[in-house]
Curated annotation (Swiss-Prot):
CDD domains in UniProt: PPase_ThiI, RHOD, THUMP_ThiI
Role played: Catalyzes the ATP-dependent transfer of a sulfur to tRNA to produce 4-thiouridine in position 8 of tRNAs, which functions as a near-UV photosensor. Also catalyzes the transfer of sulfur to the sulfur carrier protein ThiS, forming ThiS-thiocarboxylate. This is a step in the synthesis of thiazole, in the thiamine biosynthesis pathway. The sulfur is donated as persulfide by IscS.
Cysteine pairs bridged by disulfides in the record: C344-C456
Transmembrane segments: none
Protein name per Swiss-Prot or TrEMBL: tRNA sulfurtransferase
Lineage, opening ranks: Bacteria, Pseudomonadati, Pseudomonadota, Gammaproteobacteria, Pasteurellales
Coiled-coil ranges (or none): none
Protein's UniProt keywords contain DNA-binding: no
């Protein structure tokens, strides 16, 4: 099993030194991710592509899914490599492979060639295409918009028949740009803005300001972990949780109602700047879009930025909400975001749309900044990979089992894509599929006389959700221990 990985076009047009550096980083990223799932995977860098090989055909679907989510990959080809002796031999090998596929269909042949040969790429296309047309009675050549395009790459004495072409997410490899700190709330905007910086080549760390208690923090951890695991698992990142309840309380007590929204955002960027400075991070990322809510006017955004000691990046600044939600669906964070309450907007009933600097500074003069300092000093710093370990400690009261009892039902909380790809086999026991992001709204509608055993592939989400359900009064939950690490 072999894949030919093609780099993002913007990488290919850079200087040779930069292109080599980017390709080297991408090769390392691919290796870091794929070898976690298949230790025998080989990743080799060439001048204009990266070669991925694996002997384990059973891992094909998983390797394809992983490659499709690695930043820096424009597309990749699934190929079958064979040695050849001459052009007629290439035709014979191609005929044996595609004859069945071309029955009753129109086709064309496209050849890319490297090395010295007695034929050109066009001559190869004509010879192979003509031969296929003669030997397969029910097929017909069509050069424009054919049913099937037979793609062949020829390099020296080997031919690669392209079995499939898979799109990547493009962008730059993680690590080619500097680190950023994303202010993640669990909503649509912050998840998408985090993804956009990952796709642009930055390692994204996460800073969460907790305004809503343990359940809110669990939900945000789920989103951060989901984004990291799907798109940036090649790198270690930090998850920082700052308890902002005291800061919000001080604002509610000391700040004029209309100025609360801007003041709260200024406190957040102050705190985030301190965290960024601690880890030598140059920029913080927010999900704000111009005019989307009252605090997101140019005047207010400028005043918010004045409180920051780090560069503030807003990748969604010109995006419509509809576009943002569509992107959230693409990256798989939309359902998590739907379950997240928006806390920032509820503390001010009549927010100002054009804050005045002097008035903001006067209101902040009433604020006790020791509360902000204390919140930052008491922040919790976590390697995002340790979310599973931390959750295991928190869910000590949730029983983990590997053998199912009579009254127990497996609750498969993986995404629909994962369950379709790899269904859970339970034997005689019932299996209910309910993605983790729907548990908060749908678990209560299940038959509560049953005991539900939560299952996910890695064991992380099942433990997070078990904690959430326990905190909400459901005692009939357990965790399936098969994949707990």
């Amino acid at each position: 099993m072999k894949f030919i990985v093609k780099l993002f076009p913007e990488i290919m047009i850079k200087s040779e030194t930069v292109r080599k550096r980017f390709a080297k980083i991408l090769t390392s990223n691919i290796r870091n991710i794929l070898q976690k799932y298949d230790e025998e995977t080989a990743v080799v860098r060439h001048w204009d592509y990266i070669e991925v090989r694996s002997k384990n055909e059973e891992n094909r679907e998983e390797l394809i899914a992983l490659l499709q989510r690695i930043p820096g990959i424009h597309h990749f080809l699934e190929v079958e490599e064979k040695p050849f002796t001459d052009l007629h031999h290439i035709f014979e090998l191609t005929l044996a492979d595609v004859a069945q596929q071309l029955q009753g269909k129109t086709f064309c042949v496209r050849v890319k060639r490297k090395g010295k040969h007695k034929f050109s790429s066009i001559e190869a296309e004509r010879y192979i295409g003509g031969g296929l047309n003669q030997h397969i009675e029910s097929t017909k050549v069509r050069l424009k918009n054919p049913d099937v395009t037979v793609r062949i790459d020829i390099e020296d004495d080997k031919m690669m028949l392209v079995k499939a072409r898979h799109a990547g997410i493009g962008g730059y490899p993680i690590g080619t740009q500097e680190d950023v700190l994303s202010l993640i709330s669990g909503g649509f905007d912050s998840g998408v803005s985090s993804y956009m910086l990952i796709r642009r080549g930055s390692r994204v760390h996460y800073c969460f300001f907790n305004l809503g208690g343990a359940a809110h923090e669990i939900g945000v951890k789920q989103m951060a972990y989901h984004i990291w695991q799907r798109y940036s698992a090649s790198h270690k990142v930090r998850f920082i949780a700052i308890n902002f309840e005291g800061v919000v309380g001080e604002i509610l007590e000391k700040v004029d109602n209309g100025q609360m929204g801007v003041v709260l955002k200024r406190m957040m960027v102050r705190a985030a700047s301190k965290v960024a400075q601690r880890f030598n991070i140059e920029a913080i990322v927010t999900g704000e879009a111009l005019g989307q809510v009252s605090s997101q006017t140019l005047t207010n955004l400028r005043l918010i930025d004045e409180a920051a000691d780090a560069l503030v990046l807003r990748p969604l600044i010109t995006h419509d909400k509809e576009q943002i939600i569509a992107m959230a669906k693409e990256i798989g964070t939309d359902d998590i975001a739907k379950s997240m309450p928006e806390f920032c907007g509820v503390i001010s009933k009549n927010p100002t749309i054009k804050a005045v600097r002097e008035k903001i500074l006067a209101e902040e003069g009433n604020f006790n900044f020791e509360i902000l300092e204390s919140a930052v000093q008491n922040a919790k710093y976590l390697d995002i990979r340790q979310i599973a370990e931390e959750t295991e400690k928190e869910v000590v009261e949730v029983e983990a089992i590997s053998v199912l009892g009579e009254n127990e039902v497996i609750l498969d909380i993986r995404s629909p894509e994962e369950t379709d790809e790899k269904p859970f086999e339970s034997g005689a026991h019932d299996v209910i599929q309910m993605p983790f992001y729907k548990l908060s709204s749908q678990f209560g509608s299940l038959d509560q006389s049953k005991n539900y055993v939560l299952y996910c592939e890695r064991g992380v989400m099942s433990k997070l959700q078990a904690l959430y359900l326990k905190e909400n009064g459901f005692s009939n939950v357990r965790v399936f221990a098969k994949n707990i690490h």
